[in-house]
Amino acid sequence: MNNPNKKRLRRTMMFLNAQKPGLIKDPYIYKADSLMLDLEDAVAENQKDVARFSLYHALKTVDYRGAERVVRINGLDTPYWREDIRACVAGGCDSIRIPKTEHAEDVHRVAQAIAEDEKTYGRPEGEVLIIAALESARGVMNALEICESDELLFGIALSGGDYTKDLQTHITGTGIELMGARQQMIIAARAAGVQCFDTVYTDLKDMDGFRKDVENIHLMGFDGKSIINPRQIPIVHEIFTPTQKDIIFAEKVVKEIDSKKALGIGVFTVDGKMIDIAFYDGAKRTIDLAKASGVYKGDL
């Protein structure tokens, strides 16, 4: 089961209330990489069925212009999640986000439901992927188990609000309260070979703070960030897209390593910096990211 979309570009995942047709009919205009159609927290208890119908209709009729269509279903401890998955698969979503994931078994339950519905609605096996949201101390502690749980899982995402509540603290804007979870999650994700995404930044008035937050998680190795407003998209894309300077240096590294390797030379310099074979994968990733972001102009 090898779905090429597991590694697709996901710098931004923008939350949208599935209950409001006006929000989910043309969000592709904002150019987020992924659109998170929300059936969970954004929808009142007595509106779950309405939101699910609205979601199904949007998935069937709206052209999202290449943006990934992710649906956050209701929790596995609610009576709604199974019908949510049925609507997602029948409607044609690309991925499903599991909220409040704490164990590998949570992922297995969703994967089994997806498989049943793919068969029912004639979709290829393994076409619908999974992302698990970690929202508690237990979920973060079990990050590696969750990351290695199922082939359908392409990544994990931090949900900072519920996580800090579980830690008996709160979101400060500094990121200090999230540091441990972020480190644990990115290490687990990289060990398992899946992607890792950061939590939302809710203070829309503090764009300087938002930029700093994005810069920090980029340096930590995250693949992208959940967002709640279109104004946040350009900042995330700017920071997560290689500059031409980065790309040119990466090209030099790849070409030099390829040529020096044939000569048996293991260490050399590029632009005055000492380089060895350990730099190769990072340089290739930079070039691959540039290609996926549409900014690559080279010949590799």
Each PLM stretch: what is its role?
Residues 1-300:
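Expand to "…catalyze enediolate/carbanion chemistry for C-C bond making/breaking, isomerization
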